[in-house]
Amino acid sequence: MLDVRKLLAQRPLLFDGGMGTYYKAKPGQECEQANLTDPEGILAVHRAYLAAGADAIKTNTFSLPRLAAAQQLGWEQLADAGWQLAAKAAGETGAAVFADLGPAPDTENLPAEQVYLAVAKRFALLGARNFLFETLSAEDGVLEAIRALKQTVPEAFVLVSFAVLPDGYTREGRYCAELVRRMAQSGVVDAVGLNCVSAPGAMRALVQQLGDAGLPLSVMPNAGYPVVARAQVRYQGKPEYFARELSRLAAEGVRILGGCCGTTPQHIAALRTALDALPEALPAAPAAKPAAAAKPAVETDDAFLRKLRTGQRVIAVELDSPKDADLTAYLEGARRLQAAGADLLTIADCPIARARMDSSLVACRVHRELGMNVLPHMTCRDRNLNATKALLLGLYAEGVREVLAITGDPIPTAERDEVKNVYQFNSRKLAQYIVSLAGEGREMPAPITVFGALNLNARNFEVELRRAAEKLENGMSGFLTQPVLSAQAVVNLKKTRETLGEKAKILAGIMPVVSQRNAIFMENEVNGIHVDAEIIERFAGLDRAQGEELGLEVSVKATQAAAPYADGFYLMTPFNRIALMERLIARLKKEGIAD
């Protein structure tokens, strides 16, 4: 069998092309199932690619990590059959075989690391020494699995390949240059590259951005972009164009080439011919594209962040956007809160999954008309990557420099036939994506500051704290907490400060209770809120005015208890009662609790 390392030292390595889009699986059947149900068909595909001139082929096992993560019975047999078929075909020509592993889902019950390692070890037992982890959108668990694999098989050659959109980001919002850098610096990855999603021309532009990765670089684009014809997805990229673009990459230093979706033996044969026509002496790595003159960073004069960073206690006030299309009363309420001394207006993103005026559009209007700092909430529930990026660019253009990244309340089960959850991100990955958009050559000259949510009332607060630490690692700057309406919430706030330190900016949540009915409702029907029984009892029999007075006193005491551990306060407006919030802000400033 071909020695991959020796070949790469001499010339570029040519992989096969797409399996799933070339082999037509039966409706409702995974392509990998054909390893057992149609072995001759899979063997014929391998042989066709080898006849086209491929130096290496992939096992027909792309979906195995997903099947293994689902603990689907029989994935081991699919691995065995996939390896045996590829090895049989490669044995006829002396080509290399790569055990092919697609993305593994990362769950709390079964981390991606364990899934990757289980599948890779299965292949290692069968004799695999070359491994391809491909079409990844993030590095979750893959490096840990490779380190463990190389303890068992130290001679293993491992190629890690990411699926990157033409703008340089994966579907999980990771920037390709950062992912490639992490692989190159890991010490356990032997080659790194890009595959799928993008067509040859776009992938060539991405490679020019990467430059010398420090490892052999791999490129396996799709044949083109998919079109739907007669209810079938087709790729119309021509073999001649595919070969021309990829042979240019080889001439520029890319050492591993092949194809992904839509590519066929005809594409690989054309590329083989083009590669064989290149001179023997080729660059060992691509040269970086000359950098354009760096644009000076444009920093917004952000009074809220400046005040927060200089140790003054800030006041953020949440005011839910309207349920209709009229912003008149909302803008008047925002003006009053600004005049009262609010440093920031926060706007929820369709709380409890009920549609309201878009939080980001409202934020832009408030910022434009009032010059007030705004913090629109941005959930992962309703937008995919494209919509999220488009919205962030619009916010930046409007001068909005802070967002609150949250996963978002799920849509009620009864409505899911008509309204769909998206959840392409979780809040940690969304934060990482937002931060990655800023930097030299990126979309934003200066970063948007990302805050997150922290539930002080979580039943398992240790888990909540671990997640908070992960959010900080992923680029968040601080947290807005759920309301402090219990003694335990204060204890947890203190623990948060001790655990996360001064780096995390914490705005303690304060939500005035205005009646016993209101308190009972929050305790029983609002996720993440706990109201001490003593507080509930104190509101018994009070009218509206009395309820507001008591709510004001309870809120002031909550801020006093939270103040030693908070950088400011996040005040939530109950039932649009602006006058109550004006009084609360005045009390906090008068008593020196907030600046």
What do these predicted ranges mean?
Residues 1-595:
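Domain-level signal for soluble alpha/beta catalytic cores
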